[in-house]
């Protein structure tokens, strides 16, 4: 059985045996809330208000209109649009001044004890907030990124504090003095949406700009997949998927002429992005579609199974309403087949907010449904991966407005021991992708890094696309510590390397030639795996890679000038 009884940690209830449901809750009356569901509990599957009711969190709560949360490592990160709902006063005599929230709230992932609360992410010179919360992604053991209405911010974990904003992600329209009451102002433009961490990069949607590719080592944008997109996920095979607006006449918010309704958005295409080359493939949606999520931003329903190569999403064909979404679809990636697997309209119930998520352990779908905005009746559906309803759970009556399901992360990655390596004649490449797996996360998203090298004079070690390249530099031995980080939980393995060669070939090297053809940059004359840096004409680094003889660079836009640097030389190319 997947769900068992809760247990205590030093006298505290722990939340590892069920599913979190993050609620916007009743805007204008109180801050957002977090409930916990144990579907197999014999009498009461719901535990309510687990943040506010935690004795360790006296006087603290989530912010107003929370839309996103994620477990990363030992912490749960919850992002709200505002820090405080002016109507929050849950007890007689209690006011908003006595229960403080935050746009960023960090809790212990097991006990829900608040560890940090950040009310303002960025302020203008008057102290007015100019960055409302949107999303979060864990980057490594030291930091995460926070998506907002005004850029992507770097969140340090020790201590929990904002240390900067990623250049090129800002919203130049926001000053703190604008009026957004009409629903089409600066707050609703240039927003950051969903973000994902892959093995080598961070992908983030910026409204109407495209998918930004960020180097997590430098915190800089290295590539942009241009376009008008909504919501994003990563599939079991490692590819990135976004919903694409196919109405080329309305590529900018509000996607129509009728205020903020977005009636001209046509999300009839998925775009697949290769996580390493950034090559794209447009996949027409023969059934269903992807609704835009920018007005009253939500995380969107598009999500991926960790058990099979499939995506799930809900879709509302009525472009004039966000509140009557009833159809649930499955996309089989391998067969490129779209199938409607459920329709809740027969019960006059509708998916709310992000609507659905897939449990990583048993592949069951969790759906949040309601009647409409003025009725306090809600249901949590537990479904199999073919859309068959297994269980209906009904919480107490309240204006919950559920935003997102969040699953505990109970397992660290399982990593094989690494056998010793002897370098006899040149570089050796080792596939690390097959060395690690994680029961409750995507294997394709496990980040591999070289944490230490006991003798850098003997061997140079680099990891890219799950592959470790060992380049001998001198005769000798070295111990490498390779870290496998899966969603903030990590395992280290030691690799012993013995080099019997200097790695220097004494034959005359062929002349190097660089040229572009068929959307690829080719380099002829490489004698060994070579570290290649690619810059644009403004001096921005846009690619950092290791090429073996015969490899080429893909995914760079044509018609531009590039500068390549390798082997202490510089090459200029236009293709």
List each language-model region with its residue ranges.
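Repeated scaffold domains used in trafficking and secretory/extracellular systems
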Residues: 59-68, 123-141, 172-197, 226-237, ...
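Loop/turn-rich, solvent-exposed surfaces of beta-rich toroidal or solenoidal domains
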Residues: 293-373
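Blade-level signature of beta-propeller repeat domains, shared across WD40, Kelch, NHL, RCC1
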Residues: 368-412
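Residue-level detector of functionally pivotal "anchor" positions at catalytic/ligand-binding pockets or at interdomain
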Residues: 409-424, 440-445, 496-520, 526, ...
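Extracellular/luminal low-complexity segments enriched in Ser/Thr/Pro
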Residues: 467-477
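A short beta-strand micro-motif common to beta-rich folds, especially ectodomain repeats
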Residues: 476-488, 495
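C-terminal edge beta-strand
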Residues: 488-501, 571-573
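C-terminal outer-membrane/trafficking sorting elements
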Residues: 505-575
